Amino acid sequence: MQPRRIAILGSTGSIGTQAIDVVDGAPHLFEVVALSAGGGNLALLARQAVHTGAAAVGIAAGDPRELAVLIDEAAAAAGRSGYRPEIIAGPDASTRIAGLDADVVLNGITGSIGLAPTLAALKSGATLALANKESLIVGGSLVKAAARDGQIVPVDSEHSAIAQCLRSGSAAEVDKLVLTASGGPFRGRSGEELHGVTPQEALAHPTWDMGLMVTTNSATLVNKGLEVIEAHLLFDIPLDRIDVVVHPQSVVHSMVQFVDGSTIAQASPPDMRLPIALGLGWPGRVPNAAAPCDWTKAATWTFEPLDATAFPAVDLAKDAAKQGSTFPAVFNAANEEAVTAFHGGRIRFTDIVDTVDAVLSEHTGSSRLTVESVLDAESWARARAHERLAVSSL
């Protein structure tokens, strides 16, 4: 059997670097044919290109000539002089990489800029291993209409868990989905206690090692709100049948409750290499992708209700999803602006979700969901959030 040809979008980020680890551990199953990155770490991208032997490398920003020099230097150091991949540069580089000939496209880009690459990957016919939840959330019906059955395989640990659990019954037998949340670094704090939280504290996630935006979204639970919308779209389960529970140990990644009263859960130590491996190899499993639970050692798992008063983001996300249209895009864009302002020291931690709520309340939606209407709504949301943040700055 020939190895699956993999294109990795966002290769220098957390998902991308771990995906290369997965490929390294299973060279008989996978080979990397293309990489893309934003361009903020050209040296790492050059080393990745030489290491994987990718035929094409894309950068959204940065000097392609500098990248070519770095690749030559890395190739010489690795004893691979003469390796020269095609370099694709420009804002649409990831979209062009996504449209190349590959069996699987892993979209590990952060943010709604991943929408165009997601659509390009689906159009190409490749399986889409989706870590870029924002593209599905803001694209909604556009993304679903572009995908054939089974073409999108989730890489988020929660949705990967649900996909595995759903194999235990038919769609008609599913009662509800239960997404677990670690609770973030501020679990147990009241809304008042969250006012003085610093950016440094917000980035101290108790379980996962992620980028700035995703880590902050996990602290506000905006990320869990986005995951609820993603689960609703991926699995066609109504929002009122998707629950969120706090599970601080982050070993049970999500659960499916069936109509007979049984619950199937997926458990494993927190390690993103497992859902990444499943995304690349679905429906098969990759041996030794990650360490398993040690069932011979004593352990305690706890589950707690979500404090929706201190952390209103999940309910707010559900409301945006119920309204549909461009509301999820506005939710996401306003949040990204607010998170940037928070890390710039301009607003308080609790102002992030308050800003999202305020911008959503002013949005009227679009009569028809198109790529253009999504982009217009995002642009409006960012501008409106920016205006509100300028007024409410510390």
Swiss-Prot record:
Positions with a binding annotation for Mn(2+): 156, 158, 227
One example GO MF annotation: 1-deoxy-D-xylulose-5-phosphate reductoisomerase activity
Transferase as UniProt keyword: no
Binding positions for NADPH per the UniProt entry: 12-15, 38, 41, 132, 134, 211
Binding site for 1-deoxy-D-xylulose 5-phosphate: 133, 157-158, 182, 205, 218, 223-224, 227
Role summary: Catalyzes the NADPH-dependent rearrangement and reduction of 1-deoxy-D-xylulose-5-phosphate (DXP) to 2-C-methyl-D-erythritol 4-phosphate (MEP).
Protein name: 1-deoxy-D-xylulose 5-phosphate reductoisomerase
